[in-house]
Structures are given as structure tokens and as C-alpha cells.
Amino acid sequence: MIKDLCTVVCRNKNLLMLVTAGIYILALYSALSGHTLLFSVLITFAFAAFLIKDYFKPKYILIWILIFYFGIYNTTSRLKDTDELLNLAPVNSVISGQILSIPQNKGRDKTSFFFKVNKIEYDGNVREFDNEKVLVTLNTNEKLKIYDYYKIKGRLSVPFKAGNPSQFDYGNYLRNFNVYAVFYGAKGAEPVFLNSDLSAREKVLQWINDYRQKIISTHSNYLSSPNLEILGGIVFGDDAVSPPENIKQSFINSGLLHILAASGMNVAFIFSFFFFFLSALKVNYKVNISAGIVMVIVYSLMTGLGASVVRATFMLVFVLIGKLIDRDAHSISLLAFVAFLMLLYNPMYINDVGFQLSFIVTFGLLIMTPFLMRGKNKFVNWVIGTVSIPIIAQLWVMPIQIFYFNNISLYSVFANIMSVPILSVISFGGFVSSLIATVS
């Protein structure tokens, strides 16, 4: 029976890629859990048994072993218990460096962002660094730009640690971003802009972010808070536009938080809009597809590159490249391959809730919706999809919601079913108004 199952895996590209990605993910979890030796022994013995029993071809066993141990190395080489800034904390200081993330307004005149620290001045001492980061929180609404350089006065501190097993550990959360300390700006002390030459890449990315900010500013002429942040979250995601905490909590309680996260629907809408627009202009098919790829990538950069957007962008780009070279993509294997690529680039994605939700929900939809939408009547399929997709998504997301948010709303499925048609209209209006804002 086991041999038959292994034979099926070897003959099915979807299952083969799924197993490969699963082995790599297992390696990451073994490294992050601190049980690397135990998992290594178990995996090695398991692969040896598969080889002896001739369940898999030797080349598969060799590839999987290499992937497993590379996953452990790739994770452990990036992990550290502390960094130089954490060793200095707590201390009043002045830091100089570069903003690395989109500055987010947290309400009540608070702005936060990740900051690369090049230099710190404290107690008459000066130290320079190559690659140290902190999460900065300032008491200001000053318009700060990603990739600009600043000097900031404040206090370097140790992030909050959990006091019991079920409590949120802020320090561990920041480790996912390779950040080990936090910095709070001094009251009344505005950040000082430092002149510095940006690279060509940084200038392009800053221009893209400025373009997004122009769109949001145009919307602010007609919308007030929190409607502005909600629309911005629907269009660009909460990585780019952060809604007020009370609004965000309401979406969490109702099981609608995904609405505020840019997702595959946004990416698909952007591509579809430009594809049909260029098709109406009789643009060459391959040129049309290529232009769509560029627009999708630009949009993903505008959103702040949240895990769900990166996943959707990668999948769509690979599908479109397949169209250009007349190749079809296998949905499950493509999803697994994209997960593998993202975790190869940054193993800490594995702890990102957005990453987990995006891939688990997409996987659930890919394996369940084809069985429900087999009919030939398009209207019937549309009705079935409208009702079943939110239910399927909620079923797959429920364990993660309980684990991270310690709650589950019984009406969330109904709320999702009701919100899908409305969300489509709001998204369409938001994207159209955003396009108008770019030319106004």
C-alpha cells in the first residue's frame, strides 16, 4: 500500500512538488523549534528506509535529503538570540540610518517603520553598524518616505516579552523581521532628514510608493477616517495603509480581516483590467501579457509586498509566462513551488500569519472548488462559487484564527457570503478611482 502511494506521488507533478515543499517546510520548523537533531535523525532514517524498500527513486531521496538539510542551514544561519543593538538597550540615544519599510500611521500622532541603523550615539559614545535594524515608533504624523535617511533622537528599548505560554511575545514576533530591539522617538524631537544618494533601485521603489501616496491623498479629499483607511486597505492592503486599531479589531472579530489585506483578488483584478483594456485597443497578445506582468509587479510593490500579495503575484506571473511560451501550469504544484521560493528567500515567512492564511486558504480552494463547480451552467456555477468559496475559506482558516486570535465568530461565514458581492463593487470603485487619481 505504501509503495503504491509512493508510486502515485512520483507520477503526479502536483504531489511531487507538494512533498518537496513539505520537506523543506519541515526543515524550517525543526530548526525554529530547537529540535534539529531529533528531526534530522528521524528524517534520515525515514529516507534510508524508503531507499531500502525501493519506495522512491534514489535521485528523489538524494534531492529531498539535500533540500531538508539546506533548509536547516538556511534557517539556523539567519537566526540569532541577540544583536548589538539589543545588547545596548535600554539607553537614551540618537540613531542615524535609513527607513526600510512604508511608514504606517498608528493613530494619535504615531508613526512606525523598520529602520536600518548605521550609527548610534549614546552616553558620549559613537558606534557604527553594517546591518542592524530596529522598529521605530515616533510621536509625529510628519510625511516620511521609505528609503530616506534620518537622524532620530529617542530611547532604544528591549521589546516586550511574553510572561506566560499563551501570551503574545512581541520580541519573538520582531525576530521574524530580523529585528531584536525597538526605538521610541523623544517627544517634541522631530526626525532630522539626512542628505544621501539613493541607488537607482531605491529611487524607483520610492517613486512607486510616492505614487501610491498620491492616490491615497486624492481619496482623502473625499473620504474621512476610518473610511479612507478601509478603502486604502481594500485596494493596497494593510501593509501599505493601516486602519485604526478598533476598526481592525472589528474586522478580526467578524472574520473579515482578509478584506483589509491585498490578496489574489486584487492582483487578478489589476491584470484583468489592463488585459481587457489593451485587448480593446487591439494590442498584440504577447505584448498585452507582458504589459500585464509589469503592471502586476508594480502594484505588488505599491502594497508593501505582504505575503499574500507576493504569493498571488508569483503565481500569476508564472501562469502568464506559461502563456507566453505555450505551457500550462499545474495549480497545486505551482502553489507549492511559490511557497518553496518564498521560504527559500526568507525562511521566517513560515511564522507570518499572512503567509499561512494565504497558502492554506488557496490550497483549500484549489482542491475543493473543482468538485463543487462541475456544472455547465455559468450562472449556477457563479451562485455556487459565491456561497461555497467563503465557506471553504472559513473552514480552512478557522484553526489559524483560533490559534492566533483566540476567538471564532459563528456568523463569520454568513458575513463573508454577504460581503463578497459588496467587496467586488467596492474594489472595482476603489481601483477605478485610483486610476483616475493617477492622472488628476
Please give the residue ranges for each predicted region.
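Functional transmembrane helices that form membrane-embedded active or gating regions
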Residues: 2-21, 88-92, 378-395, 414-417
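General structural signal for alpha-helix termini and helix-helix connectors
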Residues: 217, 221, 236, 257, ...
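N-terminal leader/targeting segments
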Residues: 1-86, 203, 311
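Membrane-interface amphipathic/re-entrant loop segments adjacent to transmembrane helices
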Residues: 192-207, 253, 402-418, 428-440
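Membrane-interface helix/helix-cap signal primarily in integral membrane proteins
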Residues: 2-9, 64, 68-258
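Hydrophobic alpha-helical transmembrane segments in multi-pass membrane proteins
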Residues: 31-34, 54-64, 183, 243-413, ...
